[in-house]
């Protein structure tokens, strides 16, 4: 691969333990093949809150509140080689982790 290329990997998950485990797995895989890795860099957590009326009618005082937290991490693999790309393609991630890969 060209010297100026880098791979940017964005991870998203609802569980921070799961995303941290897979971020470290990607870092180990990339370092094993001789690539330089920057990250994982934690991005701001997106918190969505929902308020639902518990009462079937009229009682506005009875409400439940729920929230979902979306955790995000960014990894940059600088100067990847062919072995790095092959190793990352063979890596199987958990079902709860969303992965976006961009080659720049």
Curated annotation (Swiss-Prot):
One of its GO terms (cellular component) is ribonucleoprotein complex. It comes from the Bacteria. Gene3D superfamilies: Ribosomal protein S10 domain (3.30.70.600). The keyword Ribonucleoprotein applies. GO terms for biological process: translation. Signal peptide: none annotated. This is Small ribosomal subunit protein uS10. It comes from Xanthomonas oryzae pv. oryzae (strain KACC10331 / KXO85).
């Amino acid at each position: 691969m060209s010297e100026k290329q880098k791979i940017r990997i964005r991870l998203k998950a609802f569980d921070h333990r799961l995303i941290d485990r897979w971020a470290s797995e990607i870092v180990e895989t990339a370092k094993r093949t001789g690539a330089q890795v920057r990250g994982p860099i934690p991005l701001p957590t997106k918190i969505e809150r929902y308020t639902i009326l518990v009462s079937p009618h009229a009682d506005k005082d009875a409400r439940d509140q729920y929230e979902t937290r979306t955790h995000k991490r960014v990894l940059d693999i600088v100067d990847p080689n062919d072995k790095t790309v092959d190793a990352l393609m063979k890596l199987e991630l958990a079902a709860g982790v969303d992965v976006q890969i961009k080659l720049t």
